[in-house]
Amino acid sequence: MAKADSEYDFIFLSVRHGFVKEAVETLRKNNIKGTLVFFCNFWNTRKEVQEWAGDYDYILAFPTAGGHMQEDHLDGVLFDHLMLEGEQKAHISNYADLTALLVSADLKWEVPHDMVEWIWIHMAINAGVTSTAARSGNLENPEELALNLMNSSSELSLAIKAIREALKVVEARGVNLKLYKAELLPYKIPAWIAGKAMKVMFAKNELTRKIMTLHNDKQDIFYCCQSV
């Protein structure tokens, strides 16, 4: 546990459903210092993120991961790559130290056109997937809903269509989706083909399947869907 009046090279903030601001305030009140790495979803603007950070140096990043807390136990899975804001936009003096840390942990990273916009897009995709999954059962068992979705090409096709609708919300915020062609390519092909391809992918890729079943924090899911 971090102690009050302590200092770190980096502080990774990966908190649930919109509590980033509160997490930063907790650090500030306890005089815990270090470069903040915002490592989670948010539906806020860059200006708002800057206001959260205040006098902290910060950078935006996002893990390819899934999981949930059960009491004091974290059950999750983390891929070997993540999304990371480019050095030009981050404006932190220890960017090289951060990338060296990632290399030492055998983690690779990609730099999107804009990290805030990428997170909005990620939230829209999540909202499309989870809202489709919720159609088929009881919200008290998110893991079962995820399994039902991954095992049905027709439901996955509906998820593709829902994602397309959710992405229109992101576009309405002024995001040029053409700058994210690689990320959005799977959602451009005919929905029925994409649904079949995704079913095969989920069947063969154990880690991706694990992310879907472990990402079952209802409040986090609601935050994502309600924000979009």
Cite the ranges covered by each PLM segment.
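Short Gly/charged-rich anion-binding patches and loops
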Residues: 22, 44, 97, 165, ...
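Helix-loop-beta segment of a Rossmann-like dinucleotide-binding subdomain
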Residues: 73-86, 136-149, 204-215
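NAD(P)-dependent Rossmann-like dehydrogenase/reductase catalytic/cofactor-binding core
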Residues: 160-228
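Rossmann-like NAD(P)(H) cofactor-binding subdomain of soluble oxidoreductases
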Residues: 1-75
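Active-site-lining helix/loop region of Rossmann-like oxidoreductase modules
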Residues: 100-181
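Soluble or luminal CAZymes and related metallo-dependent hydrolases
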Residues: 19, 41, 90-94, 158, ...
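Rossmann-fold dinucleotide-binding core
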Residues: 45-128
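Short, surface-exposed alpha-helical recognition segments that flank or form part
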Residues: 15, 154, 216-219
